[in-house]
C-alpha cells in the first residue's frame, strides 16, 4: 500500500490477519497492484456482533478502481461460496444504500443474498442460504444499542482490521479535540469477545458523540467539521 499514512497500520493489519488465520480466516487477492481481495472466516470467529452459527462471514470484500466490472469480484465471491460448501450459508454486513467501507447491497443481492436482519441506524445483515432449515443469522442485541456508557464528547471504537484506523485515530482525533475543545476517547477492541459484544454493527471503526452513534466512516478533522452542526441538531 503506497499511502505513507497507512504504513504502520499495514503492519498492524498483517499481525491481525496472522492471528485470524489460526481461526479459519481466508484471504484471497488478485495478483495485481490494486485493492482486489476478499476476507472471510467462520462467523463464530468474526469480529462482529452477529449470531450466525455454521455460517461463513465475509469480513472484507474490495474491488477498486479500474478492476471493477471485469468479473474479478464475482470470481472472488465464487471462491468464498466454494469454500463454504457444507455450511449453512454466507453472511455479510452492508447498508440499504451505498456507503464507504461497506460492500454494496445491490451486488450481494445480484448474487443471491437477501436481508435477514437490520441494526440502526442503517446497517443490514445479508445472507446467502445453503441450508433452508438453518436458523437465520441475526445481529446481536449489542449491535442495536448504538450507545456507549461514556456519554461525554467523542468516543471512537476501532480495531486493526483496517490499515487506516491506526493513523486516523491518532493525529486526526487530536486535531478534533483541539479545535472543538471536546473530550476524545479512543477504545481499541483487541479481542474477538470485545468485538462480538460491541455496540455497533461495524467494529472496524465507529464514532459516538455524547454516547450515541454518529458514523462508521473514519473521521478526519474536515469530516468532523461537516458533522458538527448536525450533531447539535440531533442531540440537542
What residue ranges belong to the model's regions?
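Active-site rim helix/loop that mediates acceptor-substrate recognition in acyltransferases
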Residues: 2-32, 45, 193-194
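Conserved beta-strand in the GNAT
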Residues: 29, 33-45, 57, 62
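A short, internal acetyl-CoA/4′-phosphopantetheine-binding micro-motif in the GNAT/acyltransferase core
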Residues: 59-68, 96
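Conserved acetyl-CoA-binding loop-helix of GNAT-fold acetyltransferases
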Residues: 63, 69-82
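Conserved GNAT acetyl-CoA-binding A-motif
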Residues: 84-100
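Conserved catalytic-core motifs of GNAT/GCN5-like acyltransferases
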Residues: 94, 109-126, 214
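Local sequence-structure signature of Cys/Sec-based thiol-disulfide redox active-site neighborhoods
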Residues: 143-179
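Non-catalytic, surface beta->alpha helical segment in thiol-disulfide oxidoreductase systems
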Residues: 209-236
Amino acid at each position: 500500500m503506497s499511502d505513507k499514512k497507512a504504513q504502520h497500520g499495514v503492519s498492524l493489519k498483517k499481525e491481525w490477519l496472522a492471528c485470524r488465520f489460526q481461526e479459519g480466516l481466508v484471504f484471497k487477492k488478485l495478483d495485481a497492484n490494486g485493492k482486489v481481495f476478499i476476507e472471510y472466516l467462520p462467523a463464530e470467529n468474526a469480529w462482529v456482533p452477529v449470531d450466525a452459527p455454521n455460517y461463513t462471514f465475509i469480513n472484507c470484500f474490495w474491488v477498486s478502481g479500474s478492476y471493477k466490472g471485469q468479473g474479478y469480484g464475482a470470481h472472488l465471491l465464487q471462491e468464498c461460496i466454494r469454500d463454504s460448501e457444507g455450511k449453512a450459508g454466507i453472511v455479510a454486513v452492508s447498508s440499504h444504500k451505498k456507503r464507504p467501507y461497506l460492500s454494496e447491497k445491490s451486488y450481494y443481492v445480484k448474487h443471491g443474498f437477501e436481508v435477514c436482519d437490520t441494526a440502526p441506524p442503517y446497517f443490514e445483515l445479508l445472507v446467502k442460504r445453503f441450508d433452508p432449515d438453518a436458523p437465520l443469522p441475526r445481529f446481536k442485541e449489542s449491535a442495536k444499542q448504538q450507545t456507549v456508557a461514556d456519554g461525554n464528547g467523542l468516543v471512537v471504537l476501532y480495531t486493526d482490521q483496517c490499515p487506516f484506523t491506526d493513523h486516523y485515530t491518532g493525529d486526526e482525533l487530536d486535531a478534533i479535540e483541539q479545535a472543538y475543545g471536546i473530550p476524545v476517547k479512543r477504545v481499541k477492541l483487541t479481542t474477538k469477545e470485545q468485538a462480538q459484544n460491541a455496540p455497533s454493527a461495524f467494529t472496524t471503526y465507529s464514532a459516538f458523540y455524547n454516547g450515541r452513534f454518529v458514523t462508521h466512516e473514519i473521521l478526519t478533522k474536515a469530516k468532523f467539521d461537516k458533522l458538527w452542526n448536525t450533531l447539535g441538531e440531533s442531540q440537542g
